[in-house]
């Protein structure tokens, strides 16, 4: 039993020695001490387990808080997005209503146009029918006149039937019914074109209506989704309640939304300006089309005028000939009447009486001839007037039809533009749906993470409740046991000393733990702050992911636009294929007709060889086609641009996808790094919380856990509501995802179809070449047919000459006809020369129009570039603002982390190393992706080159086909002309034969009449020889008159034939002109369509280029710092303002070409633009003020943290004072106890041992005091770090104040007084913020003074403790060696304390230096305020001198230079501050290492020989920790210095890029100005050409108007003359009266 007791006692002593208790132990107190030791061990183990559980729960709660914060931020973001969607829906609804109104008006206009075209169609048909009827009547009249002339010549009609016009002895012959009139081909073509246009407009109207219905349905669906989303958000908002963070985020989102709305307003104003410019361009195109139509009309009118002039000259010559014949007949009549009167007066023989009836018969015949010729003359005049009226009516109808066609084309163009706008809106809605789908997916993933965390936390909460119950039970058990210990100590005096020592040790440990509780709570607060920083980093990653998803959405939109473009190109290819098939059918149809045109084919072969030579000499087949058709050159350029745009779009899509993948990988890696950091933090928390051994802290933590559990339960409910909402959104977005996948598959198939289309085009090209060869053979056959037709015409001419040779009396008329033909040929040559000159003028006008069109295209491209630049600027501003906010958040987080995370440097270094490795991996991945992108780009370039080659081949084939079609049309026209000429020759030959037969009949009739006269003369020859001679003379004259009459009739017939041929030629020319007009109209329409397509492709290319540049800017901006971003933003704001002024000036310059009535509208728009710019400046200043307010709030939080720390230090100082007082009282009690025990029970050696135990207690107390001094030093260092952070914040605020002053001075120079007031308000706000910072700095200085006082009190307490130890040592015994050693060690401790005081004084000196630096910063701030006031005064003066534009520009440049210098000064100050901080850091680190070494030496000297090994181990552990901490801290600072240098380099690079951008913009503006001048010159030339064309048209219409007047006025005198002649004849004849004169 004794052995067991001894063994148990030995084991217990070893345990007590392990616990640091070396006093002797009696066997009587064995059980009690063993029980106490077991309870202590059990309590320690339980406390450790509870502490670990609490740490785990705290970590879980922190993680849950982080996730809850992210969920809140997502909720705020969704609310902001909802508000944006509301704005978009309102805008979309307004746009939809506007489009609906425009569509309704367009439909009404189209209906009116269709009705008007239908009316004009019917009117034209009726006019054509009436014209054909009149023509048939005139032909019938001509035929009747010809037949009447033939009857008169043949003698079938008597003079009585001709002379009177009322009565006739012979019955009137009924003419055969005329053939039905045949409408002209030109009229039929015009009607067909009008019908086709009406049908196309109806189809377009139906398509537009269907698209409008579809858009309305989509808008309704979007509105329903948004409404459901609003309801869900409102429900969640009512359940979750409001939070300060939510309110702050709402305010920030409202500011962002205001900025976005302002930028949207700027973009809308620029877009409105662009639309106005496009309207001006459309107006110019309409004027060009009108000019071309006017030129064509002028050519047609000139041609018709020349024809009418030729007809008028021919009719005039015929009228003159008829007048001469009429005068000769009248003279002959008068002479015959005189002779008859003389014969009647002197005749007395029966022979004379017998010859008188014959003479009267001849006289009546001559009078009938005169009357007939007068009637023919009047009919010819009437026909000429009718032809003139018909010509004017047709001309007016043609003008009306052309005007209606132009108006219909313009309306169709407007409808197509509206359709394009609707398509763009549909694409935008699809992009928004895709963005919403991505957000829903993100919310779903976050909800899943939150649910898993909630489940884990619920399990942890249950375990925590169990552990808390166990800890409470153990605490109660411990209290009970402590009571038992106290009772046993009172009953057992023998073990009182050991019990008191154990209790005092436990009390000291509890006090130490309580003292360290505040420090641990501060560390916990620091860790919470770090968690907040991590959450902020997560928010940044989320924002980066959202921006990446936005880029992906834009890429999808670009892909959608590319798909639409490919669809349009496929449609165009289908149209080309249909046109090719139609052409092939036309060629096959013409194959049978061109079998006889061999001679024409030879000429066409030569032309084809020349064209092939030109095509072989040129670089592209499109140039030759452009020279021949003057319209197809833009097609090759458009195809090349389309290929380039396709390559760019594919590259942009690939880059966007690669960037999205890269950003997703970066986000995932960031999440992994965050997880590693969280693990490191958890490990650090476990290590820190291993030192907590107090029950009170456990209970406090348990209370905190309960509060957090309640908050977690609330957050769990909110998360469940979020989960329900996210699930509902996910179900709604599933359909959208499926539709987007289908669209992607369709795009892939469309790309494959494009490749197959290119191959099909190549095949069609070879088919077209074969068709061209077949057409050449057909042309050869047509040439043979033309030769045969010419041979037939030559034969007809030979027959005509033979007929002329047979009729001797027609020789003179034939010569006159030849003379007329020569005159006609001369007129034709003159007309050809005039036509050539007009063609040259037309070509020059076409060149002018082409130059104007090129200028307009350049202007359009410039406007689109400006629009792209503005869009790019807006996107860059938004990105910069987002990056600025993120960077400001990062900066504040970094400062707080640098101030609070000194103890967690090792984990941060590991995380930094892991991040570096991840960054290297990302760089390698980026390099690999760049290589893949280069390979893909190379493949795309190769494919694009092949596509361009194929497109060039296709363009060449199309040009060849169109050339072949043109040549075929010319051949058809020539063939038709040859046929008409052949028919005319045959008709003329038939007319000659008829005339010859009539002449032979008249000759036979005259010969018979001559025989009768000879018989009568032979009967009376014996008595009236003189009368016979006179009768012979009269007979000869009558024969001459009859010959003249016959010749006049023949001439009338010939003129009728020529008139018919002229009419046929006129119809052929009109048909050819109509064909040419249709061809030119088709070419013009195709050209306009191609121009529209080119413009659309250019705009799409610009949008893609803008998207690519925005992506590149975003990638580069991720590596920039806050100062670089701020400087770049300020510089860009100034550039944007200058650019807006340049845009305004350019718009004003462009608007000078418009009408004077629009001047007021332009001024109003300029004023509105200035007001918007002023509002933008005001909003920018407000944003700066809000940013300063947020910074001030962050400084307030930092000051509050400092104050809390100061309060903690004060409380710790108070606790130290209390401990010192307690220690003094306990020392006194121990001294009394020792004296009593010395006097009563113990020996001197036992007293010396007791004194050694008390010395050990004092050593422990001194160690605790030194630890407290070290904690105070740490707090002093933390305060210094916080002061340094405040100094950095002040320097940053100083830089921002400088940048704000520069931006304010640059932006307010050209603005209104309201902007100046806003700037002054912002300056006042900034001054107030700086004053507030100054007051806070003073408060921080006061707190530092208080802390120094607390440190002095702590040092005094340490000194008193050392004095107490020194006093207690002699009381133990003067002869003891331990007392001497203790005195030496206490003296060393005092010396070390003195050194620590010197170090504290050094720190105080450093604080004074910092105060001096703060005073210098205040001085600089006052200087900046003075500079700001000076700038405000300068702005006021500039507002007064607003008219001086040059001075304003110089001041702006000066302000830019000042801002640059200030930025450089700020950079230098930042570098100097960084170097100063680095030097201070090195000094502080050296001092700290020295203090640690001294402290370790002090500990080793105090503990003595017995504890040298343990002290050495502790010193080694502390030394290694300090060295590692110092090295890591140094590496972190070096990393920060490197980051600052990198930021400086980035700032310099951004400044250089900005300057280069400014230079490029100035060059672009100079080029734009030059092109604008060239455009003005071209427009002036075009206006002059239009004026000249209008003047020439007026001149043409003037003669054309006078000619009908002359034609109408010319016949007036002729009847008068005929009447006069008639009356003269009557008076000359005595009793003879003409029936034509008096009866009329």
Swiss-Prot record:
InterPro entries registered for this protein in UniProt: Centriole_BasalBody_StrucProt
Coiled coil: 93-148, 191-232, 260-332, 370-411, 461-722, 758-960, 1010-1030, 1059-1086, 1129-1282, 1323-1494, 1523-1557
Bias (Low complexity): 1592-1618
Example GO molecular function: identical protein binding
Site (Microtubule binding): 101, 108
Cellular component aspect of the GO annotation: centriole; ciliary basal body; ciliary pro-basal body; cytoplasm; microtubule
Subcellular location: Cytoplasm, Cytoskeleton, Microtubule organizing center, Centrosome, Centriole
Segments for region (Disordered): 154-185, 1592-1640
GO BP terms, alphabetized: ciliary basal body organization; cytoskeleton organization; regulation of cell division
Ranges of compositional bias, category Pro residues: 174-183
Recorded phenotype for the gene knockout or disruption: Basal body-defective and flagella-less phenotypes due to disorganized mitotic spindles, reduced rootlet microtubule bundles and cytoplasmic microtubules, and associated with abnormal cell division and slow growth. Heterogeneous cell size as a result of unequal mitotic cell division.
Keyword Coiled coil belongs to the record: yes
Purpose of the protein: Microtubule-binding protein essential for cytoskeletal organization (e.g. rootlet microtubule bundles) and flagellar basal body/centriole assembly.
Assembly description: Homodimer.
Record's comment describing the protein's domains: Coiled-coil domains are critical for microtubule binding via the formation of a two-stranded coiled-coil structure in homodimers.
PANTHER family named among the record's database cross-references: CENTROSOMAL PROTEIN CEP135, NUCLEOPROTEIN TPR_MLP1 DOMAIN-CONTAINING PROTEIN
Name of the protein: Basal body protein 10
Organism: Chlamydomonas reinhardtii
